[in-house]
C-alpha cells in the first residue's frame, strides 16, 4: 500500500511522513531528497554556486553518478549525503533543477522502481506525488500551511545565519516556481484529503491521516 503526501515546501510533509511511518510500520521516502542530491551533483560540478546548469548537462552528470535509497539512507556513489543536502545553498537551486522535465522523469522512475521492486508498504512525500508519480495511491493527502508558519518552521530547523524574512521570501519564490512548472506543478488533486497544518501539532495531523487510512483500508478489504 502507498500513502502519498503532497503539498508545498515546509508544510510538514517529511516530519509527518516519518512519524506516520513509525506508527504504521511503513517505509518512508522523500522525493525531495532525490532532487536535492541532483542539485548537489550540479553544485559540485559548477565553479560558481549560482550558475544554473542546462538540463542536458544535468542529465549527463546524473548518468555518471549513482543515486540510491537503501531503505534507510540516501546515497550518492555509496556515501550517505543527507548532511550535505539540507542547507541554504541547496534550497536556492533545488526548485529550479526539479523543474526540468528530464530530471523529474528520472526521480519519478526511481520512486516507482523502489515501490515496484520491494513488495512493501510506503509513505512517500513530495510535490506532485499525488498527481503525477502515484496518482493511483490508496491514500492521497495534501498538507498545507501559511507562508509565515512554514518560514518559522524552517527557521527553527536551521543552524545557519539565514533570517526569518529571507526564508519567507525564499518560500514565496519557491511556491511561485512550483505552481507554474510546465510539468509536475504543485496542485490539488480532486481525490486528495486536504489538511491545513498551520495550527495543528504533529500528533493531531498524524491522527487525522491514520483515521483516513483506516477508513480507506476498510473499503479496500471489503
From Swiss-Prot:
* Location of this chain's protein in the cell: Cytoplasm
| Gene3D superfamilies to which the protein is assigned, alphabetical | P-loop containing nucleotide triphosphate hydrolases
MF terms in GO: ATP binding; CMP kinase activity; dCMP kinase activity
Source organism phylogeny? Bacteria, Pseudomonadati, Spirochaetota, Spirochaetia, Spirochaetales
Protein name, UniProt field: Cytidylate kinase
Q: Which GO terms describe its biological process?
A: pyrimidine nucleotide metabolic process
Keywords from the UniProt entry: ATP-binding, Cytoplasm, Kinase, Nucleotide-binding, Transferase
What family is this? Belongs to the cytidylate kinase family. Type 1 subfamily.
Organism encoding this protein: Borrelia turicatae (strain 91E135)
| Record GO cellular component, one term | cytoplasm
Q: Where does ATP bind?
A: 7-15
Its EC number is 2.7.4.25
